[in-house]
Amino acid sequence: IKAHLKMSNAKEAVVIGGGFIGVEMAENFAELSGVNTTLVEAASHILPPVDKETAAFAHNEMRKHGINLILSDAVTEFGSNEIRLSSGRRIPYDIAVLAIGVKPETSLALACGIQTGKSGGIKVNKFMQTSDENIYAGGDSVEVEGFVTGEEILVPLAGPANRQGRIIADNIAGYKSTYKKSLGSAVVKVFDLTIASAGCSEETLLKRNIPYLKTFTFGFSHASYYPGATRTMYKLLFNKEGDILGIQAAGYEGVEKRVDVMAASMRNGLKVWELIDLELCYAPPYSSAKDPVNILGMHADNILKGFVKPAFIEDIDNAMLIDIRSKAEFERETINGAVNIFTPELRERYKELPRDKKIILFCNTGFQSYVASRILIQRGFDNVYSLAAGITLYKELVKDKLFNAEKVLMQPM
């Protein structure tokens, strides 16, 4: 590809598909000087394993590095020097790369009479045997059981494929080895940003009608007072029994480390409240005394115990919004329509608040709004919610234009 770009003096590169390969290709094109890069994705966001909130961080990072990101639009036709989209839009191109997903290559298996499943992948048992017990299969073309859903899924990732190869070798050699359910743990680099996930996304849980709860939080990559600390956004999905259903993270340092810990916790059946007790490595350059994984456990535990009711960006319609930060912070920026009551003033001003209307409290990342909600709950309010991850997540989503601008317009006072 680099040789072609050099020989043809190409200036316009288009990548079709926003999966991991498409995102990595777009980044590589964008890093080449003089090449304008466009990524086209038919879905509403890139990176299918994660939800829109997590993908928003990747969208903003790609735009920051000059990539023209086109979402919810599909390619309908290739011309000699332009690509036509379903919206009618036309994009010039000198080189195009199709990164539109993978389909299992099972022609050999089908020719041998081996059974395939709903997804088109080869059906195997826990020993990686196909419907012909003398033939084994592994890798991108096989169906495996999903850890959370229990359904047969395709997991086109190198880690599971390597483990399956070892299991097949063991069984051929007479050592009984089995493949466990797959979490689909994955990570991708998006310029300076890292996106990682394990387990199910919220979109998957909704499609499968699996009951769930969720929360968002921000955690520092290491102790905030140690130089170079950056924030990571975490999205945790769990159920009322405390089972961890999925984790997603977006940040610049230590992202995959925390998701790996969460994946190991899921694999070993830990409940969300047991995350609180995990003893993880700590020194100021590497983490905080309460690691983000511990904090995630505390967030979920507080929700399950009824200490706090979380609210999310999609809940702000028809709610009274209270910015509980200082007046200076409020005047610098806030959510459109919010009223300012500083947390220390709540004990005196709580009588101003209605008890018959939903109240959403928010701060920068969610900690102070939790404290404020406890103050009100202890005064008999049962209509009080804390905006998960606060105005920091809100601003990232507004930047990505995920919500109607009228509802979420940032207003300097």
What are these model-derived regions, one by one?
Residues 141-252, 284, 288, 292-319:
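Mid-to-C-terminal Rossmann-like scaffold of FAD/NAD(P)H-dependent oxidoreductases
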Residues 20-21, 45, 103, 152, ...:
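Residue-level detector of alpha-helix initiation sites
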